[in-house]
Amino acid sequence: MVTIKDVARISGYSPSTVSRVINHSGYVSIKTNKKIKQVMKQLDYVPNAIAQDLSKGKTHKIGVVLPHLRHSYFSQMLLGIMDAALQTEYSVTLLPSEYDSNLEMHYLEQLKRKEYDGLIFTSRGISLSQLTQYTKYGPIVCCENPGNKHLTAAFSDRKAAYIQAFTWLKDHSIAKIVFLFSRPATVSMTTQLTLDWFAQVYGHFPANKHIITNVTTPQDGYRAAQTIAMKDNTVQYFFTNGDDIAAAVRQYYVDQHLPVPGLIGQNGQVASVTLNIPTINHHYAQIGRQAFKLVVSPELKNQKIKIKADFVLNNQLFKNL
């Protein structure tokens, strides 16, 4: 394997001079530059990319921590991140976590070792305090409201949309609502806030039997509908965590020739248009784009960008496109 020392020996120049030519750093005469490049071509020498990154202090790689891609939240977020990355010289590395705190800490240690120029946490299992401790090693962007933590963030400002949705339900005398969530309130701030905002409008929390967690896919939604239908035929509405999941709930009732309860979806997917399901559009692709811009812009450290979510009724999702 040809090394930089071989290029230096055959060209007659020092390894440091060859390094300056390879990395385009420091002064090298035109004659010297030409000679060294001729030898590199003759030897078919390919510079070590890792060594070049070390010499420049940058990898041009951004790590994106994703628990999974089974839910539209993550796929839409990733779409926005990739769109933004394609406009830059950075590449994106997907770092699957399944909310495993050990894996997430491993990725933070990789940031500490400069294996990435920055990390985007689309969601997390570890605490915000743990994330904060690693910001001294490189940019970290989270995709949730970090509150008073010194973290850079791009996230959905969802409270007004949720209050509007629950008020709409209450105004229509909807009392029995089933909630579908990915994770329980004990580990998910999104779940906890949703229940809090429901209580703010209704004056009480939903019954525990009407809260179903571990729902991330349409198949999960279908099974959740089956569970509810077998126990309670008085449910008026399902407040779901995805339009595709809402569509799966509907499909169960259709398959069983049962009256279909009302549905509210989330994430502004095509299913909300084709089935005319009210939805909460969080604009996750836009959040992903903002998260990427923040992680590659260290001067924006600790900035918090809120993207307003919208409660969308009457098949108006594509109205302004």
Which residues fall in each region the model found?
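N-terminal helix-turn-helix/winged-helix DNA-binding helices
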Residues: 2, 41-79, 88, 110-113
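Central regulatory/effector-binding core of bacterial HTH transcription factors
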Residues: 86-128
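Hinge/beta->alpha junction and helix N-cap segments in small-molecule ligand-binding domains
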Residues: 67-75, 95-102, 154-164, 180-226, ...
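Short beta-strand segments enriched in small/hydrophobic residues
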Residues: 17-20, 54-70, 176-185
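Short, well-structured alpha-helical segments in soluble
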Residues: 102-115, 220-234
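N-terminal helix-turn-helix DNA-binding module of bacterial transcription factors
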Residues: 1-60
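Flexible loop/hinge segments that line or gate small-molecule binding clefts
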Residues: 122-161, 244, 267-278
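Flexible loop/turn connectors
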Residues: 232-237, 241-321
